[in-house]
């Protein structure tokens, strides 16, 4: 589906004002019969930014209120984020009850209802988009575009029931990324030999095989970062990657960079003026 609008905006002004719906009713018909979510964070420096902690606390409250089964995992001390993600993926696949893996990096901030929306969408791989540090107008995810009859490039995707958009992605960022179990299983089927052994990653299981879902790699004289590699290989395995743009996100370093990708694509002059972070659980 091609999403069109004036001045390459993907939504009407009315749709652009729509915020993610708070899915507080666990009996909604779109909810799967069984869901176990693993929320995982690689901590290199053994610390998380305070906005990350605040957002996570509210997510825990919301998922608990909804009766969604979940666990929080952290992996500390690995200086290679791609290796940390692969270690988490391996452990995730060893839990037969786990259905969804949600990576959230320790320098993120988000509104909790958006995370819940992403969990219960049917697509296999969905990422949020957040501002690049030091440049709020640049974003970490790259949508797919196609040329319309008007000669302009338009993002590809579909309109969700709440009036917001879900965009097909060329690249999804790893710092706020939901992956369904079936996506990792299909990756392993497509690339059965793309694994390594790392005894130091888990001394209690020194023979475990770690698939390279994430890695930095040079191909065709291009350097692929770990999330670019993941996105590329998922598409080559026949899977689609998607962006859920309507998340109020912050990306923190020496200071915070905040924005809403939905507002950015809808033509907002400065997405830092998007609605305040909704961290209140009703």
Where are these regions (language model features)?
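Active-site nucleotide-sugar/metal-binding loop of Leloir-type enzymes
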Residues: 86-100
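Short, Asp-centered acidic motifs that coordinate Mg2+ and/or phosphate
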Residues: 100, 124-125, 241
């Amino acid at each position: 589906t091609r999403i069109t609008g004036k001045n390459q905006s993907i939504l009407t002004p009315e749709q652009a004002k729509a915020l993610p719906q708070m899915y507080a009713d666990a009996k909604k018909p779109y909810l799967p019969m069984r869901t176990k979510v693993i929320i995982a964070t690689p901590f290199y420096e053994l610390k998380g930014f305070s906005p990350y902690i605040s957002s996570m606390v509210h997510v825990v409250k919301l998922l608990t209120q909804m009766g969604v089964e979940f666990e929080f995992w952290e992996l500390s001390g690995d200086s290679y984020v791609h290796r940390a993600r692969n270690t988490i993926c391996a452990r995730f696949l060893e839990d037969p009850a786990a259905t969804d893996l949600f990576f959230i990096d320790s320098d993120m901030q988000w509104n909790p209802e958006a995370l819940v929306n992403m969990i219960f969408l049917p697509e296999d791989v969905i990422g949020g988009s957040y501002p690049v540090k030091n440049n709020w107008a640049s974003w970490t995810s790259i949508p797919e575009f196609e040329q319309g009859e008007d000669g302009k490039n338009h993002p590809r995707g579909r309109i969700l029931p709440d009036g917001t958009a879900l965009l097909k992605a060329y690249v999804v960022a790893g710092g706020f990324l939901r992956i369904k179990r079936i996506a990792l299983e299909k990756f392993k089927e497509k690339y059965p030999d793309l694994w390594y052994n790392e005894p130091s990653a888990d001394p209690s299981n020194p023979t475990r095989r770690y698939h390279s879902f994430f890695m930095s790699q040079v191909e065709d004289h291009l350097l692929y970062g770990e999330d670019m590699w993941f996105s590329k290989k998922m598409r080559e395995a026949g899977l689609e990657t998607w962006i859920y743009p309507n998340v109020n996100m912050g990306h923190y370093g020496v200071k915070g960079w905040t924005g809403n990708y939905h507002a950015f694509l809808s033509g907002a002059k400065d997405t830092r003026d998007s609605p305040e972070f909704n961290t209140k659980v009703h």
